[in-house]
Amino acid sequence: MQDEAQRVMTLGEDWAAAELRGDTAFLREILADDFVGVGPRGFTLTREQWLSRHGTGSLRYEAFGLDEVQTRLFGDAAITVCRQSARGVYEDENGRFDLDDQFRATLVFVKQDESWQLAGLQLSPILGRP
C-alpha cells in the first residue's frame, strides 16, 4: 500500500515537472482521456484544452512546484492534496497575465490497467486561515 502511495506521489512530482517544461507529450500520457481540470476561478478545462495551453505557447512557467503533499489511496483511486506554487505568464486574445500564485490543489488519480493517470484536479486560491 505504501509503495502505491509513493508511486502516486512520484507521478504528481513528474506532472509538476512536465507542467514547468510544457511537456505536452508526457502530459498526454498521464492525463486520463476524460480528465477535467477546475481552475482557481471555477472554470473547467478538458484534457485537450489543458494540453493546448502548452501546445500553443499561451502558458509559460518560470517556476512550478508542489509541497505540503498528502496522498491517500482508495482502492484504484488516490487523492493528493498539496500546495501548488506557480510563476509565469499566460497570454491569449484578452491580453497578457502574469502569474505568481499559490493554490491548494486536489489531484485525483485513477489506476487503469496497472498504470496511474491524473483524472482531475481542482485549484483553490490560498486566502488565509478561516
Summary of predicted features, one role per range:
Residues M1-E29, V36-P130:
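A beta-strand edge to alpha-helix "cap/lid" segment located at domain peripheries
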